Amino acid sequence: MRVLAAMSGGVDSSVAAARMVDAGHDVVGVHLALSTAPGTLRTGSRGCCSKEDASDARRVADVLGIPFYVWDFAEKFQADVIDEFVSAYARGETPNPCVTCNQKIKFSALSAKAVALGFDAVATGHYARLSGGRLRRAVDKDKDQSYVLAVLSAEQLRHAAFPIGDTPKPQIREEAARRGLAVAEKPDSHDICFIPSGNTRAFLGERIGVRRGAVVNADGTVLAEHDGVHGFTIGQRKGLGIAGPGPDGRPRYVTAIDADTATVRVGEAADLDVREMLGRAVVFTSGTAPSGPFECAVQVRAHGETADAVAELVGDELVVRLRAPLRGVAPGQTLALYRHDPDGDEVLGSATIAGTSR
């Protein structure tokens, strides 16, 4: 099998590439250049997509004895990931750019180019498993990345390979060291790769500008002014611009964002509870939507807990009714669906949260 190994320069993708070589596949390594301007992607060894990371990936490819290339996907990354990230926050939503990158870049643009060049699969260092064509959680639940892959279609998964999903992260590092890979102890990336400073509010402010509005309580009383809804997300407690807790002494949280009126509403923790979610851009990883309501477990954050629910496709929207309230759910987040069984490992699909109700 001809395999294109996506190599970020980190330990996970490096071991993934090595395992594909060990399996006897015809492997070619590729690193994606995603920066459109100097300084837009972090430098150093903590992230992906920097020049240092490209050099690390090349050195690993040399050790493995495989061809290696750097492909320029900067313009598409800017349009499909960065610009959409900014637009979503301007709409008062809370997106996950890693989800978008997987859906639009790694398993769409990259995969399409790979197939056009005669490759059978794209191998990545994601912590997830494929079994019988079905996407499943990784063995290492702490590192599991099935959530950010739940947006992939059956066709996208058909050309994907996740060689390290059956191994805990500590063993991956040990394996890299045994193989003599210099990235064995390279730190993991935790922040958004295109926000080197880690200051998301400042990054968004530079691109959206000032759009002043009001912070109000549940009855509409104005408590403060703000410079833009992009500085807030559902469940946020700090940086609200209001003095201390509410009159009852309880902390206040962002409970709703109206981008049209630039209004941010705050309330108590209990006001964050939701019992129903509406999803758009629905994807079922099997390629077939269940008929009628179905039991499932839902996850709304990359490493969040799952919650039992009943979901149903109504037209082109997904209606999800929770068995118990879920707190702090924001429009724009990805809603991942898992099979409701003792293991809870199989990914059924996903949707983008369009709205919630109590």
From Swiss-Prot:
Keywords (A to Z) from UniProt: ATP-binding, Cytoplasm, Disulfide bond, Nucleotide-binding, RNA-binding, Transferase, tRNA processing, tRNA-binding
Annotated EC: 2.8.1.13
Broad class of enzyme this protein falls into: transferase
GO BP annotation list: tRNA wobble position uridine thiolation
GO terms, molecular function: ATP binding; tRNA binding; tRNA-uridine 2-sulfurtransferase activity
Protein's UniProt keywords contain RNA-binding: yes
Location in the cell: Cytoplasm
Pfam families referenced in this protein's UniProt entry, alphabetically: tRNA_Me_trans, tRNA_Me_trans_C, tRNA_Me_trans_M
Coiled-coil annotated spans: none
Catalytically driven reaction(s): S-sulfanyl-L-cysteinyl-[protein] + uridine(34) in tRNA + AH2 + ATP = 2-thiouridine(34) in tRNA + L-cysteinyl-[protein] + A + AMP + diphosphate + H(+)
GO cellular component labels: cytoplasm
Annotated disulfide bonds: 101-193
Principal location class: cytoplasm
Signal peptide boundaries: none
Functional description taken from the UniProt entry: Catalyzes the 2-thiolation of uridine at the wobble position (U34) of tRNA, leading to the formation of s(2)U34.
The protein's name: tRNA-specific 2-thiouridylase MnmA
Organism, as annotated: Mycobacterium avium (strain 104)
Origin organism lineage: Bacteria, Bacillati, Actinomycetota, Actinomycetes, Mycobacteriales
